[in-house]
Structure formats: C-alpha cells, structure tokens
Regions:
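DPxDG-like acidic metal-binding loop motif
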Residues: 1-43, 47
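Hydrophobic/proline-rich hinge and linker segments of small-molecule sensing/allosteric domains
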Residues: 42-45, 49-50, 65, 69-71
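Short, surface-exposed loop motifs enriched in S/T, G, D/E and P with embedded aromatic residues
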Residues: 49-58
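An extended, acidic
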Residues: 57-172
Length: 172
C-alpha cells in the first residue's frame, strides 16, 4: 500500500530526559518523506527521478465543524476514548475517515487533514511524529492533553483553538 510508512526519530537529553529532536515519516512506495525538527518541517518528493523539497505547514482550521477528522480505527478509538464522546466529534466534523496510522499525522502536518486521534500508541510510534507535526505548526498531545510519549495516546491538530476544542470534547 502507498501509505505504508517508516518512522524514525533522533532523541537527545535536553536536561529533562530524552525526547525527539529530529524525525522522519517516509512513504517509500509513494516517494515522499517528511522531515521535522524544532522550528520547521520539509516535504521531500522523488517521483520519476525528479526531486523536490517544500516546507510543510498545517492548514488553517479553527473549528471541528470545518475539520477533516482522521482516526486509525473507528472501533479502537470508540472503545478506548468513550463511544459517545468520540461519536459527538465524528458527527460534528466536516469529513471523517478511518485512514490513520502515521499517514494521518503526515496528512495533518502537510495540510491535508486537520485532526488525527489515536488512543493507543507505543513510544516508538509517537516519538517520530512529534518533530514533524510541531515543525509544521501543528500541536500533538495525549488524549488528556498531556505528554503523548508518557501517556501513549495522541491528539494531533492543526493547532490552537481547534486543539483545545477537541480535547474538551474528548474529556467532557
């Protein structure tokens, strides 16, 4: 599948424990790779021997009603986050798709979606997502609003008011 991805993160101890400082989300079959770091993210494309490199940026979206919402699995998300709360978000979103895993985070970071929710992640899954998402201007926390590396869940959004709105809905 074109959206099978490879994740890689480089960590460094900045004085408060190890955390990711540089990462990559790559989709080899599609010839695309996102690289993120504190303060930036870039999209590399290699198609038919032609290589291009462009800055990545989340798109402007401030309301769930205007958002494209992605999850890895509807069943897993509903079971673990709480069916009625998740269903309310689904009903409010402009568009809802169960097309997640690392492609969902890539979609938010590259401006193709606005919200990605994953209630069950491993450390090695989320570590590579953080620099790419944040470097593109997005926000990524756990579903409770905490550190996704420690709580092993993630809410990724285009940022600001949208992120707060999603967290309020999930934790109501």
């Amino acid at each position: 599948s074109f959206h099978f991805g490879n994740l890689m993160a480089l960590e460094r101890d900045e004085g408060n424990g190890f955390g990711p400082i540089l990462s990559s989300i790559a989709f080899p079959a599609a010839g695309i790779r996102a690289v993120g770091w504190q303060g930036g993210a870039v999209l590399h494309r290699n198609a038919l021997g032609i290589t291009s490199e462009n800055p990545m940026k989340v798109r402007e979206c401030n309301r769930v009603e205007d958002a494209t919402l992605l999850v890895t699995s509807h069943w897993t998300t509903s079971e673990q986050v709480g069916d009625s709360r998740m269903q309310t978000l689904i009903d409010r979103a402009k568009l809802y798709r169960t097309w997640g895993d690392c492609f969902g985070y890539f979609a938010v970071a590259s401006g193709g979606a606005d919200i990605m929710i994953d209630p069950d992640l491993s450390y090695w899954d989320v570590a590579a997502l953080i620099p790419v998402v944040e470097g593109a201007g997005g926000v990524i926390t756990s579903t409770s609003g905490g550190n996704p590396l420690k709580e092993k869940s993630a809410v990724c959004t285009a940022g600001g008011a949208l992120h707060e709105e999603v967290l309020r809905a999930l934790n109501a």
